[in-house]
């Protein structure tokens, strides 16, 4: 019974995280018209294309919303401040899975190992 509850919680956490990211883009302006939806749908079609998305651990500084999907969830662009040899700092971003997704996948592998 405990295993079933843990699996259900992990599934809900991963599902809510993957669905919340697309809803955030869509619900920014609640009073939208059909003219506003068409560019949004066109942009989503481009993002779904595997050839145009940014793979894991690749640079996404200039295009933060175009990370590829990994399984059921979409990776996020994470930014870091990097200092070079001269001491000048710059911001670098790379596509990576969120911490919640990493915990979910680790838990899933542990549960699979039990069976």
Curated annotation (Swiss-Prot):
Residues 21-47 form a propeptide. Residues 1-20 form the signal peptide. Keywords: Calcium channel impairing toxin, Disulfide bond, Ion channel impairing toxin, Knottin, Membrane, Neurotoxin, Secreted, Signal, Target cell membrane, Target membrane, Toxin, Voltage-gated calcium channel impairing toxin. Disulfide bonds join 53-68, 60-77, 67-95, 79-93. InterPro entries: Spider_toxin_CSTX_knottin, Spider_toxin_CSTX_Knottin_CS. One of its GO terms (cellular component) is other organism cell membrane. Expressed by the venom gland. It is found in: Secreted; Target cell membrane. GO terms for molecular function: calcium channel regulator activity; toxin activity. Belongs to the neurotoxin 19 (CSTX) family. The presence of a 'disulfide through disulfide knot' structurally defines this protein as a knottin. Monomer. Interacts with CSTX-13 (AC P83919) (Kd=370 nM), but does not interact with CSTX-1 (AC P81694). This is Toxin CSTX-9.
């Amino acid at each position: 019974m405990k295993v079933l509850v843990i699996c259900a919680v992990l599934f809900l956490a991963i599902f809510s995280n993957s669905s919340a990211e697309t809803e955030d883009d869509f619900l920014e302006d609640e009073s939208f018209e059909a003219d506003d939806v068409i560019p949004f749908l066109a942009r989503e079609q481009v993002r779904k294309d595997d050839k145009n998305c940014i793979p894991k651990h690749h640079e996404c500084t200039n295009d933060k919303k175009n990370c590829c999907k990994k399984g059921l969830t979409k990776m996020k662009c994470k930014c870091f401040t990097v200092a070079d040899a001269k001491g000048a700092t710059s911001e670098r971003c790379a596509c990576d899975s969120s911490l919640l997704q990493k915990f979910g996948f680790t838990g899933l592998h542990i549960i699979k190992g039990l069976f």
